[in-house]
């Protein structure tokens, strides 16, 4: 009977230790590949396609709750203030 109680207590302690480790692992888990959920963006740049006094460049996208990861948005921007020509 003592052996059964010791076994149950040992199994209980081991299960607690394992559950604490998995919570830490889940807390530190990095998503495998978040980019397929992001909208498709234009990564190519061609200055010939931009209007006069505009340059083609890539700017980082803002971090929002919908897109919590940085991405690049390439396109035509105003030469002096780097504001996009068209808002998507």
Swiss-Prot record:
Q: Does the keyword Disulfide bond apply?
A: yes
Q: What is its main location?
A: secreted
Q: Does the keyword Cytoplasm apply?
A: no
Q: Output the Gene Ontology terms for molecular function.
A: toxin activity
UniProt keywords, alphabetically: Disulfide bond, Secreted, Signal, Toxin
The record's tissue-specificity note reads: Expressed by the venom gland.
- Signal peptide residue numbers: 1-22
Q: Name one GO cellular component term.
A: extracellular region
Q: How is it modified after translation?
A: Contains 3 disulfide bonds.
Q: Tell me where in or outside the cell this protein is found.
A: Secreted
Family per record: Belongs to the scoloptoxin-12 family.
* Stated name of the protein: U-scoloptoxin(12)-Sm1a
Native organism:
Scolopendra morsitans
């Amino acid at each position: 009977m003592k052996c059964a109680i010791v076994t149950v207590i040992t199994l209980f302690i081991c299960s607690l230790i394992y559950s604490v480790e998995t919570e830490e692992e889940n807390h530190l888990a990095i998503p495998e590949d978040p980019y397929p959920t992001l909208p498709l963006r234009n990564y190519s740049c061609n200055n010939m396609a931009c209007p006069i006094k505009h340059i083609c460049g890539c700017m980082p996208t803002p971090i929002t709750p919908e897109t919590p990861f940085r991405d690049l948005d390439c396109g035509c921007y105003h030469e002096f203030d780097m504001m996009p020509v068209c808002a998507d």
